[in-house]
Regions:
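Acidic, Ala/Val/Gly-enriched low-complexity intrinsically disordered segments
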Residues: 2-4
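Pyridoxal 5′-phosphate
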Residues: 6-288
Length: 288
């Protein structure tokens, strides 16, 4: 059976329904993850974590170990550096396929939370002065805190759409009364880590665009990415952020997609560097 250098199988296996999973298949699946039934500190245990993370694939550990040992930086004129650049370019293309994002660009950051703060900051500071920043009470503190801070600095009002306690959701109909032509930035939580419910991002985006077509719309997809498909091309948004450690990867980095429009806003960049680059410093190729 063909595998890559990190032990990932190159074929797509058809996964049987849960009732048909054999002991051998279950053992095969469990064998792909680290610390399945044992904590290095606690000893034997079952990993029940509803929102804070996921088990880590052994292939992720091997991949991280491999690239952590390479001393070369990206952007140098040598074979090692060229390979790192190739790996990153391929990873970005794969991300576009995985999240159906034929346009825009991907970049890495410290964490999903840090990336949401950065996108919100640049959207608030780069949009027309005044107006509103719109979110909902369903959202994680990552977006609510970022919007509260940067709306105040940008001289904008931060408005929160109340969610429905009974359904654990917020809908396009809930957003609609609060959208005005002065809505500069809007945030949407794709899936709640508290209620477990997913919202209709495309419907909420459409309601916003109808009244405020120039609004920068940023989506917190951190919890959703582990549980549902992502179709960025269908959402009509400007930013989408995930935390790969919730998808069987590891801690230590986050992933953001941004539209060309958001990417072109003023942002932190090195003197003499590419003006559309949102990554500062050398990237961890193993994360890609």
């Amino acid at each position: 059976e063909a595998t890559d250098r990190f032990g990932n199988r190159n074929e797509l296996r058809k996964i049987a329904p849960m009732s048909e999973i054999s002991p051998a298949l279950l053992e095969d699946i469990r064998g792909k993850f680290a610390h399945v039934d044992n904590c290095p500190q606690q000893g034997p245990r079952v990993f029940f974590e509803n929102a804070g993370g996921a088990l880590t694939l052994n292939s992720v550990v091997r991949c991280s170990h491999h690239y952590a040992a390479i001393p070369d930086n990206q952007g140098r004129d040598n074979a090692g550096s060229h390979e790192l650049v190739r790996v990153i370019a391929k990873a970005k293309k794969d991300m576009g396929d995985f999240m159906n994002a034929p346009d825009g660009s991907f970049f890495m950051g410290e964490s999903g939370t840090e990336l949401l703060f950065r996108l919100i900051m640049n959207a608030c500071l780069g949009s027309v002065a005044g107006g509103d920043v719109l979110g909902s009470t369903l959202e994680h503190p990552a977006t609510r805190s970022g919007c509260a801070r940067w709306a105040k600095i940008a001289g904008q009002s931060h408005i929160l759409v109340p969610h429905d306690d009974a359904t654990g959701l917020v809908t396009a109909q809930d957003y609609a009364p609060h959208v005005t032509p002065e809505t500069r930035v809007a945030t949407i939580l794709h899936t709640s880590p508290v209620t477990g419910m997913a919202v209709d991002v495309a419907a909420i985006s459409a309601v916003i665009r109808k009244v405020a077509p120039a609004c920068f719309i940023i989506v917190d997809g951190i919890q959703h990415a582990a549980h549902g498909g992502i179709d960025i091309a269908s959402y009509d948004v400007d930013g989408y952020v995930i935390s790969p450690y919730k998808m069987f990867s590891r801690h230590g980095y986050g992933l953001a997609w941004i539209s060309d429009r958001l990417r072109s806003l003023p942002h932190d960049v090195l003197f003499g560097g590419p003006k559309d680059n949102w990554e500062l410093g050398t990237r961890d190729t193993g994360a890609y």
